[in-house]
């Protein structure tokens, strides 16, 4: 009975709008359809869909660097399905002009950041793509966490767009602060043999913090099959100076 009810419900679900988007292809069309969302299945959602369509198309194109599109919307209120036709001319794109990327603090001398900033995913002259800028921003923060710059933060992040000129200036400054070191290693299991545990360590107190080493220690402990649960976590709130304690829960 439950299966029959589910099948009946699925069969009864029907859209109330027929949508057509023409004039654009590829990533532009894919992004527009993603911003528009699912075709509505109720009259109320249908009205909201139509009212917000232009703004969503504009936002979808701006995310890809197209700030002066021509959008024609035609709505036919036929029943049971309205017909919404959206014709789009994306127009000329905004292109990246100036790129100002700075790594400040101890990470300025870190080869890992040098490699990251040598290939940021876009160049001067490229069409502005907000997704690529955001992707690079996340990579900077992620690398900082992995390499031990746990107090690092982005202190400046902006895109200045001149629509009439068709240009965009990009700025991102990351202040890493100091690179922290491993502090005391705290084990909450008093039954484990200390020599056995020490033989599996992938770092020592005083070594530079590295997320990969934490993961390696956790993997080693898990592979012993001695413990039902293994959790290795940095104790950020208990850090003193440049040392961060590591808690090993077994």
Description of each model-found segment:
Residues 1-4:
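Sec-dependent signal peptide recognition
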Residues 7-10:
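N-terminal signal peptide c-region/cleavage motif recognized by signal peptidases
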Residues 13-27, 33-250:
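Periplasmic polypeptide-binding modules associated with outer-membrane biogenesis and secretion
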């Amino acid at each position: 009975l439950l299966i029959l009810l589910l099948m009946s419900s699925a069969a009864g679900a029907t859209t109330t709008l027929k949508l057509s988007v023409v004039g654009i292809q590829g990533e532009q069309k894919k992004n527009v359809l993603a911003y528009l969302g699912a075709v509505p299945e109720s009259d109320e959602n249908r009205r909201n869909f139509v009212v917000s369509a232009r703004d969503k198309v504009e936002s979808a194109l701006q995310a890809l660097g197209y700030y002066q599109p021509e959008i024609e919307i035609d709505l036919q209120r036929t029943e049971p399905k309205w017909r919404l036709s959206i014709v789009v001319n994306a127009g000329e794109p905004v292109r990246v002009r100036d790129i100002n990327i700075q790594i400040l603090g101890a990470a300025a001398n870190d080869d890992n950041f040098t490699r990251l900033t040598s290939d940021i995913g876009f160049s001067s002259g490229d069409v502005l793509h907000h997704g690529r800028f955001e992707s690079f921003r996340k990579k900077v923060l992620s690398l900082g966490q992995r390499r031990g710059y746990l107090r690092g933060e982005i202190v400046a992040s902006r895109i200045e767009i001149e629509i009439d000129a068709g240009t965009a200036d990009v700025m991102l400054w990351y202040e890493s602060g100091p690179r922290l070191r491993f502090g005391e290693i705290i084990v909450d299991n008093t039954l484990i043999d200390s020599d056995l545990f020490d033989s599996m360590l992938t770092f020592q107190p005083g070594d530079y913090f590295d997320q990969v080493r934490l993961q390696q220690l956790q993997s080693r402990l898990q592979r012993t099959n001695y413990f039902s649960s293994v959790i290795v976590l940095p104790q950020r709130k208990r850090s003193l100076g440049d040392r961060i304690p590591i808690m090993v829960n077994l």
